[in-house]
Every structure is written in C-alpha cells, then in structure tokens.
A protein has these predicted regions:
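Ferredoxin-type iron-sulfur electron-transfer modules and their immediate structural context
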Residues: 2-218, 222-224, 253, 257-260, ...
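Strongly charged, low-complexity linkers/loops
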Residues: 220, 230-238
C-alpha cells in the first residue's frame, strides 16, 4: 500500500516541478504579440484564401503589422477595411481603382480539339495529357480549376465552354489566377468594360486555324482607336486601360470577335457604312480641291 502512496507522491511532485519549469519557461521565452495584429485581423476577410501570399488571415495580419505587406494586402476585404487597417497602422488610406479578374479567352466551343479528353475533369490534369486537348496552346480548357479555387462564387464555366468572371462577386483575391495552368486570368479595372479575350501569340494564320475567336494580330483595332489605347504586342492585341475610354470602336472592326463585348453583325455593318460614307466624302472633297487648284493654275 505504501508503495502505491510513494508512487503517487513522486508522480505528483514531478508533475508540480515540470509544471513550474514550463511556467517559468513560458514567461522567459514568451513571444510578445503586437496587439495591433488582432485589430488588423478583425478587418480581414476571414476566408484564409491565401490570395495575399501568406498562410491564412492571421499570417497576413502579422505581415501587415510587421511592415512586410501593404495595408490593402487582403483584396477580398475591400477598400473600406483597407482604410480601417491603414488607420490602425497610422498610415494614409490606399487609393486606386478596384480590380477584378478577367479570363483572356473566349474560344470555348469555337476552339478546335486535337482529341477528346476523358480523364480527370480538371485543367491541371488535362494539361498533363499531351499538353491538353485543344489545338490552341493558349486556350481555356474549360474544366473549371479556377471555378473550384474561387471561394466567392465569382467564377463559372460560360455557355460557350470558357471560364467567365462575375465582376460583382469577384474580390481579385488571385486564387483563380494561381489555379489556371495556362495563366489566362489577369486583373483589370472594374470600371472598364472592353477587354481582349484572347492570349494567343501565334501568327495570324496559325492563330486562325485553331480557333474562330482568336486574335490574329491584324492591327485593325490599333488603327481604328482614336485614343492610342490598344496595340498589338507579341501577336495579340493589348489594351492600355489608362487611355481606353470604352468607345468600343475596336470591337466594331475586329473580324474575329476577340474583343469583348463583341459587336453584333448589325453594328459592324452599320459602322462599315459610316466609314464608307466618310471615305467617299473625303475623296470627293479631295477631288474638288484638286479641280479647284487646277482651275486656278490655268
């Protein structure tokens, strides 16, 4: 009986000693936490999406307080919360237009296939099988890796088979951009409505042969733009959003409907008629000027 009592006493004493050692160690080696971290954390989205590049919202809050991340590092939190975090950190509120994701492909059912893929319905998996089923090496595969990555319900596969973004739901967290194996998703200003929905850098004939909606780098959009807001770069049209005013002239001259929102056939014909009338008027004016000059020379 005494052996049992001694064993209990020894274990109790050891437990007390170890507990005391741990208590002292916790005080000595305690890592002081900045109280601002909790305040910053309360203004983050709480989705732990990882779009900021840090391990969860707590990691993002710690990075902001440490000065390793900007106060607007959490895109889903929005401008209002970014301003609140800036106030906590004693900084000026960040300014800048809201950004949303945009998928640079509108090929879908109009993109030619090399073979019928019947494997795992995932874009990353599909690209590992002979580089994917599409003839176009730049096209959206349409299996929804980006849709699965989005925690805000902003991504879906559109009627034509390509991924599309709901700008009202998009927080520009970047999860879809990371998930896309072809890097087709980019950030664009939310207020801008005209976008080039193609990333194909192949030359005209090659691009034309793989998709009915591909940009062929013809440069008609570049020539038509009055604001110098669109240029062909590496074989594909690129919009300068700082210059673009959304006039949509580029959509009316694009022969491939690669610029969204695509103009209807009626709008294109109407615009062609206007351009023809302008050309005829200019030609008539030039002819009249030449005749007048010839008459005065006699």
């Amino acid at each position: 009986m005494m052996n049992v009592i001694y064993a209990i006493l020894v274990l109790g004493i050891l437990g007390a000693v170890f507990g005391l050692v741990l208590a002292v160690a916790s005080k000595i080696f305690e890592v002081k936490k900045d109280p601002r971290e909790e305040a910053v954390l309360s203004h983050l989205a709480g989705a732990n999406c990882g779009g900021c590049g840090f391990p969860g919202c707590a990691g993002c809050a710690a990075a902001i307080v440490a000065g390793d991340a900007p106060v607007n590092a959490c895109a889903p939190a929005g401008a209002e919360n970014a301003a609140a975090i800036a106030e906590i950190m004693g900084q000026a509120a960040p300014t800048g237009e809201r950004q949303v994701a945009f998928v640079r492909c509108n090929g879908g059912v109009n993109a030619k296939k090399r073979f019928e893929y019947r494997g795992v319905q995932d874009c990353i998996s599909a690209t590992k099988v002979a580089a994917g089923p599409l003839d176009c090496a730049f096209g959206c595969l349409g299996f929804g890796s980006c849709v699965n990555a989005c925690q805000f319900g902003a991504m879906s596969i559109g009627p034509n088979g390509s991924a599309v973004v709901d700008p009202d739901k998009c927080t520009n967290c970047g999860a879809c951009m990371t998930a896309c194996p072809r890097h087709l998703i980019t950030s664009v200003p939310a207020s801008k409505k005209v976008h080039v929905a193609c990333a194909n850098q192949d030359k005209g004939k090659a691009a034309m042969s793989v998709c009915a909606n591909s940009c062929i780098g013809c440069g008609l959009c570049q020539k038509e733009c009055k604001k110098d807001a669109i240029h062909v770069v590496n074989g594909v049209a690129v919009i300068d959003y700082e210059k673009c005013v959304g006039c949509k002239l580029c959509t009316k001259v694009c022969p491939r409907d690669a610029i969204l929102p695509a103009a209807t056939a009626e709008e294109k014909e109407k615009y062609k008629a206007i351009k023809k009338a302008q050309a005829e008027k200019a030609a008539a004016a030039k002819k009249a000027a030449e005749e007048a000059a010839a008459a005065s020379a006699q």
